[in-house]
Swiss-Prot record:
Composition-biased stretches (Low complexity): 414-430
Chain segments annotated as coiled-coil in the UniProt record: 38-78, 100-121, 143-184, 304-320, 360-387
Gene this protein is translated from: mcp1
Superkingdom, natural source: Eukaryota
Record-level Gene Ontology MF annotations: microtubule binding
PANTHER family per record: FASCETTO-RELATED, PROTEIN REGULATOR OF CYTOKINESIS 1 PRC1-RELATED
Biological processes per GO annotation: meiotic cell cycle; microtubule cytoskeleton organization; microtubule depolymerization
Protein name: Meiotic coiled-coil protein 1
Composition-biased stretches (Basic and acidic residues): 436-445
Keyword Transit peptide among record annotations: no
Positions of the UniProt region annotated as Disordered: 410-446, 467-562, 573-592
Length: 661
């Protein structure tokens, strides 16, 4: 139908064109008509072909560009393309315009972020990540890349903000430090790089160290001044810590040191003397003594040292007050101990007179009696105060529990084996050897109890006299071996006479003479070893013997001359004087001549032979000899007991009062 219409129209076109050609004189045939149709169709075809080529080229360009944009944008989804070329072209144009707009937006965003990253990186001194560009455009502006750039930018912003705050904080601190140190320097430029912040921190630490050093020095100066004056010093110096202020503080301290140097020196020397005096009185060993250095040897004498000295002195004064009279008794004990050793050494190197062994014997008895009394007093004191007394760094109780070894000890190997040879009761004592050796005498401890207590004066001796450190050998006696062995056993047990009472109590003795009062005797169970040779040089500096207070004695009950010596002494062993009661004077004062005779007789009599086994005939003979001096039985009893106590009477009337040797 359509072809028929086209054929009709072509016939009409042919007829019309033929008519017109005839009018014009042109020849027009069907061939011409066909050529015209073909030429028109050919031209139209060429136009279409050109158009198609153009459209295809455009489509290709669009496709390639779209593909590149999709790649840069990271788009992987496929698009639907129409079949016709014109539709394809239009679709590509539309899609290209859309994707190009997206690309341009992301490109601008990426460029802005990258520029900011570059700027912050330069400020912070950080490295910039390389970004690939193609003809000025980003090669990759996908969402992932944009997220990375955004994260990097946020990180740099955070670092920048922190460093900015740190920089401001450091500069504020620097300003304060500079003001405190009176330093006027221009602040460094803002440099937020790591090195810049590091330099600021180093500079700040230097200023802070300088400030702390100066502040600590000022504090030391203030504390030292406070220790000197005892209160916070008031000063009008500036409150900053500049070099000038520090110099002013140093000058202030130097001037105050000069003022307090004399004060501290005087106070230190006074307190040092007081402390050393108390330390010697309290028997503190030299190793344990404090504050022994001279003032010039101490690098820094301050108020704290003075206070510590006062505290130590206060402690010693409290201890001295608590010990009371016990301290004097301890001193007498140590000094008498040194005198015993000195006398024993003197007798060992000298050929002394007949009175020398007797003097040493009296000293030894004094020592044992004083030691026994000191043990009793020390035990009571320790129980009351619940603490121990230390002498030269060691407990006094352990020192007293050591038995004193007499300076003259009989050599048992040289004792005569003549057991039956005994002197007659009326005969004089055997002769003593004096050819370079010590006489054969035994110093024994006597446990005697008296009715009356006595007051003991202080006896002083040189602190350089050493203690007994060993047993001193002596020449053998001419008496029997059996008696000598018995005497040795009695000596080692600590008493001259055996104590028949079962109690081991320690009692003070009652009688005395001008040679001093007698102290309680140490019972055999009180100690077990010899006194060590230690600490004697720790005693007070050398002092001379001085006169002492005298003590009055009471008269004892009369005893018949026929009674044995043991029976005369026995009442003394069972009586204890009332506490705090002092003895009275003698009832019957013998004549001076009789006293002298009795003294010489008692000194020459060998009292070492007296024991519980002594015969009654010997005792009676001695009493008869004493009776020959026209003395009463009461006087004889007194003389015997006084001499057994280690005392004797002098020839003058004032000798009725006991004094130390």
């Amino acid at each position: 139908m359509e072809l028929a219409k086209i054929g009709d129209r072509l016939n009409n076109y042919y007829n019309n064109i033929y008519t017109l050609s005839e009018k014009l004189g042109y020849s027009f045939t069907k061939i011409s008509f066909n050529n015209i149709i073909l030429d028109a169709l050919s031209g139209h075809q060429r136009k279409l072909e050109i158009k198609i080529i153009n459209i295809e080229s455009k489509c290709n360009e669009l496709s390639s560009e779209i593909s590149l944009l999709r790649k840069r944008l990271g788009i992987i989804e496929e698009i639907e393309i129409p079949r016709t070329l014109i539709d394809q072209y239009e679709c590509l144009v539309t899609y290209h315009n859309g994707i190009r707009a997206i690309y341009n937006t992301k490109k601008n965003e990426a460029k802005n972020m990258y520029k900011e990253i570059e700027r912050l990186s330069v400020i912070l001194g950080e490295s910039v990540d390389e970004v690939n560009f193609v003809n000025g455009d980003f090669e990759d502006i996908s969402d992932i890349k944009l997220e990375q750039l955004s994260a990097k930018l946020n990180e740099l912003h955070q670092i920048y903000r922190l460093r900015k705050e740190k920089n401001i904080e450091i500069k504020e601190e620097l300003k304060k430090l500079q003001d405190s140190l009176s330093i006027k320097l221009s602040m460094p430029a803002d440099d937020l790089s790591k090195n810049g912040i590091k330099h600021l921190i180093i500079y700040k630490e230097k200023l802070r160290f300088s400030l702390e050093s100066r502040k600590s020095r000022v504090d030391e100066i203030v504390n030292e001044m406070k220790n000197m004056c005892g209160k916070n010093p008031t000063s009008e110096l500036p409150t900053n810590y500049s070099d000038k202020t520090l110099t002013l503080w140093e000058n202030e301290l130097s001037s105050m040191r000069k003022v307090y140097f004399v004060k501290y020196k005087t106070e230190y020397e006074f307190l040092q003397k007081r402390y050393l005096s108390l330390a010697r009185i309290m028997f503190v060993s030299k190793k344990e003594m404090l504050f022994t250095s001279q003032f010039k040897e101490i690098p820094n004498v301050n108020r704290e040292l003075i206070q510590s000295m006062k505290q130590e002195i206060g402690n010693l004064e409290v201890d001295l007050h608590l010990q009371g009279e016990l301290n004097n008794m301890i001193r007498r004990y140590l000094l008498l101990e040194s005198r015993v050793y000195k006398e024993s050494q003197r007798m060992k190197v000298l050929s002394g007179s007949a009175s020398q062994p007797f003097t040493l014997k009296r000293l030894q008895k004094d020592f044992q009696l004083l030691k026994a009394k000191l043990i009793c007093a020390l035990r009571e004191w320790e129980e009351d105060n619940e603490k121990k007394i230390y002498v030269f760094g060691k407990p006094l109780s352990s020192r007293l529990l050591m038995i004193h070894s007499p300076p003259i000890l009989q050599n048992q190997e040289n004792i005569s084996s003549n057991d039956n040879s005994k002197s007659s009761p009326e005969s004089s004592p055997p002769a003593r050897k004096t050819t370079g050796k010590i006489e054969n005498k035994k110093l024994r401890n006597i446990d005697v109890q008296s009715k009356k207590s006595i007051r003991f004066p202080l006896r002083l001796a040189s602190h350089e006299e050493p203690l007994i450190d060993r047993m001193v050998n002596q020449s053998p006696d001419t008496r029997s071996v059996s008696k000598s062995k018995r005497l040795v056993r009695e000596t080692s047990s600590g008493c001259l006479f055996k104590n028949h009472s079962k109690s081991n109590t320690l009692s003070p003795r009652r009688k005395g003479s001008r040679h001093g009062p007698r102290e309680p005797c140490l019972s055999p169970d009180a100690s077990s070893s010899s006194i060590p040779v230690t600490d004697i040089k720790e005693i007070l500096p050398s002092q001379h013997d001085t006169p002492h207070n005298s003590v009055k004695l009471t008269g004892s009950s009369t005893t018949p001359a026929s009674v044995s010596l043991r029976q005369m002494i026995e009442p003394l062993l069972s009586r204890t004087p009332p506490k705090g009661e002092f003895t009275n004077s003698l009832d019957d004062t013998p004549t001076q001549s009789n006293v002298e005779k009795v003294d010489r007789f008692l000194e020459n009599h060998d009292w070492e032979t007296c024991s519980e086994s002594s015969s009654a005939s010997e005792d009676q003979s001695l009493c008869k000899q004493l009776s020959s001096f026209s003395l009463s039985s009461s006087d004889i009893s007194k003389k015997l007991k006084n001499n057994l106590n280690g005392l004797h009477f002098s020839s003058d009337e004032g000798s009725k009062l006991p004094t130390f040797l």
